[in-house]
């Protein structure tokens, strides 16, 4: 199918597309067809002038526009016919009595030119298969042999004029290639207008879909951005809270250290105050020691008296030691322990008294 030459519609140049698709190449241009149209106009003018240039018919003919071409690109059947004569080709009306009497099967022909109003297109046999080369189609349309007659009959019912092309067409690559192979067409080509409408509809649908997707993507991005922002704010708050807690902890430690230093200084002050009354403390200790010694001496005397009364009752028993030595040893032993205990006790009492005095202040 790629080897088949197929010109698509441009403007109203369907006559040009029809001829080039028939001949399978860029054989004619609008300028060449316009030149043929001007020649036909001049031939018609000369025939009209034969009746007199002053006649009413001649003046009317000159005032009328050309019947062989117009500014849109339309060309008449006469222009097409004269263009084909250059290649030795002739056009015969398909439904004319002369052709119908020949009873030729359409599949035995080589090509047809179809016209409806101002549109022209070609149906041609390439190799062993028929193709509709209408320039309004997006590509060549394969026509089976059995469908060809029905296709032509349908065109006639729709008002088309069908012309049979007689003569030898120029050789072309597509004809040579399709002589050896047959092609299959899975999808029929669409009309250019239908394809453009479909493409436009697809573009509109795609645009709408893209807008929806962009809107969704945008909202999704906004949602993601909001989530990221919330996450960042939460982390920031956590960091601030942690910083506040750390600051509070540092502040508490600092205050604790300051309090400890104050307590230490107060203790040092109290200790220094205690040192100032050490003489008084020494006197208290001596008085306490003397009181304890007096108690111990009284206890020793009472014990000696008990021993003497016992000796008078038992004259055979002798004391192991003298009472003076025993009292001295006990006094010495008691004095060392009691002195240590008394010192500790008095120190504690002194500290308590100082604390009470400080508290009252």
From Swiss-Prot:
There is a cross-link at residue 200 (Glycyl lysine isopeptide (Lys-Gly) (interchain with G-Cter in ubiquitin)). It is an enzyme of class 3 (hydrolase). Residues 1-180 form the Josephin domain. Gene3D superfamilies: 3.90.70.40, S15/NS1, RNA-binding (1.10.287.10). Its EC number is 3.4.19.12. InterPro entries: Ataxin-3, Josephin, UIM_dom. The active site is at 14 (nucleophile), 119 (proton acceptor), 134. It is found in: Nucleus matrix; Nucleus; Lysosome membrane. Disulfide bonds: none annotated. Residues 294-305 have a biased composition (Low complexity). Monoubiquitinated N-terminally by UBE2W, possibly leading to activate the deubiquitinating enzyme activity. The keyword Calcium does not apply. Coiled coil: none annotated. One of its GO terms (molecular function) is cysteine-type deubiquitinase activity. The modification Phosphoserine is found at residues 219, 265, 272, 328. It comes from the Eukaryota. One of its GO terms (cellular component) is cytoplasm. Transmembrane segments: none annotated. Keywords: Hydrolase, Isopeptide bond, Lysosome, Membrane, Neurodegeneration, Nucleus, Phosphoprotein, Protease, Repeat, Spinocerebellar ataxia, Thiol protease, Transcription, Transcription regulation, Ubl conjugation, Ubl conjugation pathway. Residues 258-338 are annotated as: Disordered. Deubiquitinating enzyme involved in protein homeostasis maintenance, transcription, cytoskeleton regulation, myogenesis and degradation of misfolded chaperone substrates. Binds long polyubiquitin chains and trims them, while it has weak or no activity against chains of 4 or less ubiquitins. Involved in degradation of misfolded chaperone substrates via its interaction with STUB1/CHIP: recruited to monoubiquitinated STUB1/CHIP, and restricts the length of ubiquitin chain attached to STUB1/CHIP substrates and preventing further chain extension. This is Ataxin-3.
């Amino acid at each position: 199918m790629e080897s088949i030459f197929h010109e698509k519609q441009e403007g109203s140049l369907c006559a040009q597309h029809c001829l080039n698709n028939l001949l399978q190449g860029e054989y004619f241009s609008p300028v060449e067809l316009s030149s043929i149209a001007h020649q036909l106009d001049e031939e018609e003018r000369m025939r009209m002038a034969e009746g007199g240039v002053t006649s009413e018919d001649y003046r009317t003919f000159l005032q009328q526009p050309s019947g062989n071409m117009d500014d849109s690109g339309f060309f008449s059947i006469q222009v097409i016919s004269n263009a084909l004569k250059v290649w030795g080709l002739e056009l015969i009306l398909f439904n004319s009595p002369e052709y119908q009497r020949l009873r030729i099967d359409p599949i035995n022909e080589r090509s047809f030119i179809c016209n409806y109003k101002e549109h022209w297109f070609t149906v041609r046999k390439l190799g062993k298969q028929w193709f509709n080369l209408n320039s309004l189609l997006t590509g060549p349309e394969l026509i089976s042999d059995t469908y060809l007659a029905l296709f032509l009959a349908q065109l006639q019912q729709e008002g088309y004029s069908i012309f049979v092309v007689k003569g030898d067409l120029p050789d072309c690559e597509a004809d040579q290639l399709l002589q050896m192979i047959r092609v299959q067409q899975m999808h029929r080509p669409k009309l250019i207008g239908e394809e453009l409408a479909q493409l436009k509809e697809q573009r509109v649908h795609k645009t709408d879909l893209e807008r929806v997707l962009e809107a969704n993507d945008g909202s999704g991005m906004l949602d993601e951005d909001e989530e990221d922002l919330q996450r960042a704010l939460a982390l920031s708050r956590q960091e601030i809270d942690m910083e506040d807690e750390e600051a509070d902890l540092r502040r508490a430690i600092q205050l604790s250290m300051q309090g400890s230093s104050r307590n230490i200084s107060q203790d040092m002050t109290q200790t220094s105050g205690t040192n100032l009354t050490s003489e008084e403390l020494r006197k208290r200790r001596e008085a306490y020691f003397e009181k304890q010694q007096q108690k111990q001496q009284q206890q020793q005397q009472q014990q000696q008296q008990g021993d003497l009364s016992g000796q008078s009752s038992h004259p055979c028993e002798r004391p192991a030691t003298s009472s003076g030595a025993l009292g001295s040893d006990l006094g010495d032993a008691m004095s060392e322990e009691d002195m240590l205990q008394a010192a500790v006790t008095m120190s504690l009492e002194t500290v308590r008294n100082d604390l009470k005095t400080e508290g009252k202040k």
